[in-house]
Amino acid sequence: SMVENAPAIFLLSEMDGNTIYFCRAFNSMEEVIEYRQSRWGENGWNSKVSEKWRESVGEDPWKGTGADVVMNHMFRMRTDLSYLPEGTNLDEELPNNPYRRHVNIAVDWGKRGEFIENIKAGIENDKKLNNDYIRFMFQPIFGGIDGGDFMMVVLGESRASYFTGLEKRTAKREADGDWQKIQANPIATWVNEESLMITY
């Protein structure tokens, strides 16, 4: 309540481990800069919030928990490489799809342009096949996974329902000649993946 124009905040909790990502979402880089200046700039609010925090929870609230703050990441969403079926209402879909599959992708050297064109071709092919799912593509600005050039985030109602939907999509794709052509010469590899649940 002390922060003006605060960004959207959400948590991502790893399903197969104990990592928690504290996330902030901004609509533009201008919003990021404005937020950081209001927080860390001269007369910024960070010191006031930190003081209130210490009054509420003490000097070392994480003592004994084993919490380890690793690093910060910043990604920008590539709307041109993201997939949303026509007519999708994200205000309705996001709360109903709390599962997130994060896949970090390494693109072969010198093949980034070709990779982007393949992703765009895949989007058009999924439209043709009437594949019904939501996928966001992100590109790291700083941080990110070692070797990861892009991060693909696919949504689902649950992990089980996500993989059920993936199986159906895969069957339609593998039976499609255009999809086979798009995938004929792989130019990227998966670095790692995580299954996460989101809390708004």
List PLM regions with ranges.
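Short S/T/G/P-rich N-terminal loop/turn motif that feeds into the first structured element of a domain
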Residues: 1-200
